[in-house]
């Protein structure tokens, strides 16, 4: 421990020791994440070492930020109180550093990134998150082990800390150090940019620091498109957006007058089943050999299958946004998370104007991610786990009830509404294919709790069971079902927007109404809303940005993808990525979507990309200006 006691032969001060300990723990954390990337994400070590080296420098402002309170501690407290408080606070400090490092490992295992806006959200929705952690990991044993390890580290550091205390000088000198640290943090941490130096996203994440990324995400949970991204004249953007949508008007507000189409007695029910984290790669239809989705594969053969459909994002709220408002993804938080958004142009409002009864049915607590508030504000009738029929739920975990119980509630709701003469539109959100992957025993041949394969197979079992029961209902033959994922199970990849991590299944199933077919046109999640409306005979009644996939020329197919800060426009094998600071890059995407080669920007692609994403921002601005975005 001698190297912890002095630097260049001079004894460390307390803040210096605190800084050095933090820096060392950051390096251990980074090496652990490097090992995870190499062994589990199959990344080449040589491509990541630059990120590791860069990260050692990027840690400095965070290290100084963590050291500054120790300089203030020694300055403010008199020796008597400082001696009493120093060891307990030092123990808490070391434990916090270790705990955050382990937490970063858990988060990386799930998302392959440093802390981001998802981690910020997790601190808001503590019930689900803490419950999920408790059900997924032996928390008590982990915390006990971390506490024991902390005590061991503190004991090992007892002499360096004593020497550091002895090295403290007069208050004038301590004040100079405290002010110097504060200025250094402000200058290095806020004035100097932190660009992405590497084309490999894993390397960029390794070069970052979890403390820094968390603070940045907390400060930037909503991004103003005009301020940060490339723009074009508004009039040109809106003209292009109307042309791309295939009709004369697009809108964020529900202001359109719907034409008469179906007679009320012939209106089919519409059921959208959004499956949690159901990546296309899990289905045999798309090449999987594990046999974990037999029911989905059967439905894909018997229904209308979209083989090249891509999610707009990597979170449930993005999927909900796409399948309700059909808006291109915007940087920052999804519209579902925005407060006080009312009377938005949604699939539910469009159908409600023609006599359907909109419902949102969720297996979890709808307060999570603002789901209940969002859908209630759009005039959906909301049913979450709190409102399920008493005695119905026999199995649940922190994220939600078992999918089979969710579907049982759906059947109850639909029976009741149909019996009352209503035409039902139900948007259903499942939860079982989510960590901790627990489900009722005896349903599938993978025991619970399980890994992802178990969650996928149980979710497939539940949907198969649902359709077997639904087929016995008198309303089944007059119901159109859309089965689609909210997003993929993983968002990790080597590129800024790893295309293969956005490929999701989408199946329209209605044996008496829809002819089985395979559609290979490249399409976006937002296109499913106009496609459904066109199938219902309501083509032209909507004002959405998406297009009817069935009438879209294959050469005009495109997908809209997003991370938190980057938005991508995929057309053919090219993807244009719009980034903060008005940066634009274009990549040639490999056939499997896993590789991306940087190529020169193409003006036509750039203009189209800006039209979609700037256009979405303009629609929401106009929505707010109309007064329809004000409080309920």
What are these regions (language model features)?
Residues 245-632:
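Solvent-exposed soluble domains appended to multi-pass membrane proteins
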Residues 7, 43, 120, 124-125, ...:
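Short coil/turn linker and secondary-structure boundary residues
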Residues 138-140, 144, 236-240, 375:
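Long, well-ordered, tryptophan-enriched scaffold segments
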Residues 25, 126-127, 208-211, 222, ...:
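Alpha-helix initiation and N-capping motif
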Residues 145, 197, 226-232, 427-429:
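Short coil/turn segments at secondary-structure boundaries
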Residues 221-223, 227-259:
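Short coil-to-helix leader/linker segments, especially the first N-terminal amphipathic alpha-helix
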Residues 2-224:
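Transmembrane and membrane-interface helices of multi-pass
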Residues 84, 225-236, 336-340, 546-547:
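Short alpha-helical "patches" and their helix-cap loops
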